[in-house]
Amino acid sequence: YFLLALVCLGLQSCLFQEEDYFDDSSANRATADVKRCSELLEAAPNGWVMEYYVGKDYSLGGITLLCKFDDQRVTMASQIAGADETVSSLYSVKSEQATMLSFDTYNYLVHYFGQPQGSMADDPNGTLGGDYEFVISDATADRIELKGKKYGNRIVMKAFSADQTWKQYLTRIKKVEDDAFFYEYDLRMDGLYTGQMLRSNYTFIVTYYDEVGKVHQKTVPFMFTT
């Protein structure tokens, strides 16, 4: 009986022993990560280039946003606006189930894509599928990876180089876009027609034939860069 009692006590101690794998509480870790991400956002001297993809499953493609963060205020520019136009609004970094970046007050350069359009016949309250709240997946001094909270698109921000101005950068992107004025392309292999590629917004709709002549179609998102 004595040995049995010892075994039972040993089992009980194993069953109820919890090991703390972290040096700090989850609340303190979350607070520290919010502080770390906030400092990284503000530390980029010339701001960030955001590769902003729009639409469910990237269905409208990507545009360039430029962002400069400073003490809860963000200044933004975009390839879809004038090259010298900037818009400022409020942002926050907070902890929910993960560390989040949220553009809190209205900034048409980003919120336009997430607001009801009213002109969609099938859904007057439908949006273009753009997020303005993001889970911060990874963050370093040079690169921050985000995931849209609602639509789930992967968004990458890269620290903007200090050797050019925002206006110069956006002007170059606009020139690349203006020079790419063709919207329809034939696909050929060894001189034989194999399909067609149509540009729609910032995507290519690719229609092609396989080796048995069956038609396939897929949408490929893209964005203009310099």
Where on the chain are the PLM-derived regions?
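Contiguous, well-ordered beta-strand patches that form the walls/edges
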Residues: A77-D131, V206-T226
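Sec-dependent signal peptide recognition
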Residues: Y1-L4
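Hydrophobic, ordered structural segments
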Residues: L128-M157
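Short, solvent-exposed coil/turn segments at beta-strand boundaries
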Residues: A43, L66-T75, Q97, I136-I144, ...
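C-terminal motif of bacterial Sec signal peptides marking the signal peptidase cleavage site
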Residues: G10-S13
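Preference for solvent-exposed, low-hydrophobicity sequence contexts
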Residues: R154, K158-T226
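Short, flexible beta-strand-to-coil junctions
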Residues: E51-S59, Q79-A81, A139, K147-N153, ...
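Acidic/polar, low-complexity intrinsically disordered N-terminal segments immediately downstream
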Residues: L15-M100, Y108, A139, A162-Y183
